[in-house]
Amino acid sequence: MTTFVPDAKTWADTAYTAQSESVATAEELQSIATLWEGIGIPAANFFDVAFQLAMRCSDGHASSLTVLSGNCTVAPTVTLKAAAGLVKAVLPLRQFCRYYAKFVWNWRLSHDLPPANWADSQFPAEARFAAFDFFDGVTNSAAPQPPDGLIRPPTELELSAAQTAKFAALARVRGSGFVTTAAEITHGRAEVSRTMLLSPP
């Protein structure tokens, strides 16, 4: 007989691990680890290099266009560009960085060091620690927690500033005909002169 709902004990024992298409999976990370070993990054140093990549991207941006200079601290013969290139061969760089977003967040808070481009990115000083483009990983339950958890959760201002920055990054003035009237972009205004255009999907 088919059971459509569980009994009390089965329900109490039911477990679920959060997954998100915007965050790297363990299988994807293992694929990257294998590729990295092939260029001289030991498996034991995977986190060190992953964290260095995420930190560097948090100072700039994490995208297919990201080109990182310098070498891996724990594997000096390997360039960050090469390490990032192998990440991109498996999944988008930002998706990889989101996996480590909570570690980036904690480190920057504990060292009082906001992302380098926070002012250029038009973030208010009160939200400067949220000024990295994979910040949404801090609130994504599929991204792992640091051993001691978050130092603190993001404030409403930080969440709002990051969301605004995300929409601003999407908005482009182009003659593509893709127009948005989303309140996040127009702030409720309807002036024709304020129309914002989005890139084609």
From Swiss-Prot:
The keyword Ribonucleoprotein applies. GO terms for cellular component: helical viral capsid; ribonucleoprotein complex. It comes from Lily virus X. The lineage of its organism: Viruses, Riboviria, Orthornavirae, Kitrinoviricota, Alsuviricetes. Belongs to the potexvirus capsid protein family. Required for genome encapsidation. Forms ribonucleoprotein complexes along with TGB1 helicase and viral RNA. Its main location: virion. Keywords: Capsid protein, Helical capsid protein, Ribonucleoprotein, Virion. It comes from the Viruses. It is found in: Virion. This is Coat protein. InterPro entries: Pltvir_coat. One of its GO terms (molecular function) is structural molecule activity.
